[in-house]
Amino acid sequence: MDVSEVSGVPPWFADHLREEGIESLYPPQAAAVDAGVADGESLVASVPTASGKTLVAQLAMLSAIDRGGTALYIVPLRALASEKREEFAAFEEYGLSVGVTTGSYEDTGEWLADKDIIVATSEKVDSLVRNGAPWIDDLDCVVADEVHLVDDEHRGPTLEVTLAKLRRVNPNLQVVALSATVGNAGEMAEWLDAELVDSSWRPIELRKGVHYGQALHFGDGTQQELPVQRTEKPTEAVVRETLDEGGSTLVFVNSRRNAEGAAKRLAKTTVDGLDADERAALSSLAEEIRAVSDTETSDDLADCVEQGAAFHHAGCSSEHRSLVEDAFRDRLIKTICATPTLAAGVNTPARRVVVRDWRRYSGDAGGMQPLSVLEVHQMMGRAGRPGRDPYGEAVLLADSHDELDELLDRYVWADPEPVESKLAREPSMRTHLLATVASGFADSRSALLSFLDRTLYATQYRHGDGEDNLERVVDTTLSYLETNGFIDRDGDAIEATDLGHTVSRLYLDPMSAAEIIDGLADAASPTAMGLYQLVARTPDMYELYLRSGDREEYTMLAYEREAELLGELPSEFEEGRFEDWLSALKTARMLEDWASELDEDDIAERYGVGPGDIRGKVDTAEWLLGAAESLASEQDLADVSAIREARKRVEHGVGEELIDLAGVRGVGRKRARRLYDAGIETRADLRNADKSVVLAALRGREQTAENVLEAAGHQQPEMDGVTPDADVKESAAAAGTDDGQANLGDF
């Protein structure tokens, strides 16, 4: 189908596609048009990676906008939100406006009301619905990207319930669900009352196989010689041959440590294939990476990148990941070793994909478990870049002939599993039942069950034990919510209490709220450590794991600081509870170290974490402490100012005396300390400061000093003709604090 044949979209869209080099639609895209995606029909598109799902979404959104409507694009990851924002920004030259929102859960997003396309994570959309964002009622089209992730036990229920709420608010809403190839696409379409495009078509061939011995064994029975040299491992041999052919490789492993170890080893292979220009460009990129943060993770990543390899996992900062992804797309980095999160939608195609580890540790199973077919196929789908590669190859690695047969059966020849709803788990139900009642979607038990009838769970288990199980979980959850004061019940009728409304607005798990309220009940003046440990033990915080030898250290710390901890310390004989308490204490001490201005690299080394982990814990703690502040104020529980101070300290990573300074835009934790040591102790001091002193404290960086002074409200922030104060400069040099590197808290 020629792009000019598509009706219902703005006249300029066909010209735009031609400028992008697109003259005709892929078969799945044409099938979507035939199914009415540009005429307002709901659609489930279950097609492989790189088969044009985004264009299907654009057809739906632009046709809705052309009819005077608004479109919402839901993504599973913040990184994907940024990527989609950049893609859709191309439409701004045609008069459309695009907004992205992934931040505060208390924000109603009123500023988005005049946007044509809104990009948001499912959690953010859920919070906007809870908080009554007025533009939600006016949506005409919603696109749910990576909708197969409703199968994820942590994030899936939020997407599932959010789609049910959006369809309840607007019964005529067009829903376009973009999915990987799954085993029950028809059931997904039934849930959403949608047309179905279910296709295995790809723009270039994907050859799936297993490497064993000295050859690749493909699913069609053919073999390709790929010898492993005496000093090599199979992964290195695959990467080496791919480089020789001018291609790039994604290597998927099962842990962060394995990702880093594999990247360091493969860097010895990739470096031999670099030319002089690539070496120079990679050297510059490595310096950018080192400037992101002063941690061992940053240094290790930069060392790998200089040699043409990289690792990618959640412990890396978002800046690290973006730099690596961009350089890989530009074919500068030749190999990325990643954990499976990279397979979840971020656009990083490669000539070859190697699934090195097809098992990973499962705490629930108590050991190593095989990955699902769906997850492995998602990784494999990254192989082959349309327009760049003649084909894509996805390879698993076998150590024996028996394992070769097993991998062919389990992954190469297998169809992906059906997607299954995880809504009926009690942690999900706690949050979503309270939100459903508090936001007015149900005012009785029967109305709740009626609302839940619009979910995927109801579609899958409408008859038999599943329906009975849903009612049991609902009743258990309602009992918990009533016992803890979040709802009132009168017969069948249900109403959220003031506390319930607050908890829903704050986007807290009710169990987190109950833990915080209980901890603050007898805490007149809580310390920062006590507050950090309190929020760290809530279900909304993924606390740090206890490593070998940690139990003794943190048991001693628990008894030493027991007076500060909020709530009753469990007995050591309560094995599970005591371990959880110690894990929360370890997390709290990391937050305390951060708020005490310990260097980021020291924190990373002490706790065995990366900059991305630190940022994640800091952001979560800031949110939970903000929620604790609101709960304490509304419930008259504890000294709100103490909670506020602990929140601001963890937000900026500073001691109490630096909170005011660190709040100035562009200052951050290290610059605040330098200014303070130079005698500038408050925002008011900075507003009236001698510019030469500020310039010296900020290491002579004129633009930085000018920006900081302007943010503080200085009357004349310009640095023309200003020289650094010699006494301050000499003092700073003696202190030896000029590391010249950025830090999580610098900006």
UniProtKB/Swiss-Prot annotation:
Ligand binding (ATP): 29, 47-54
Keyword tags: ATP-binding, DNA damage, DNA repair, DNA-binding, Helicase, Hydrolase, Isomerase, Nucleotide-binding
A molecular-function term among this protein's GO annotations: ATP binding
E.C. code: 5.6.2.4
All residue ranges annotated as the Helicase C-terminal domain in the record: 234-434
Catalytic EC class: isomerase
Quaternary structure (record): Monomer.
Protein's recorded name: ATP-dependent DNA helicase Hel308
Lineage: Archaea, Methanobacteriati, Methanobacteriota, Stenosarchaea group, Halobacteria
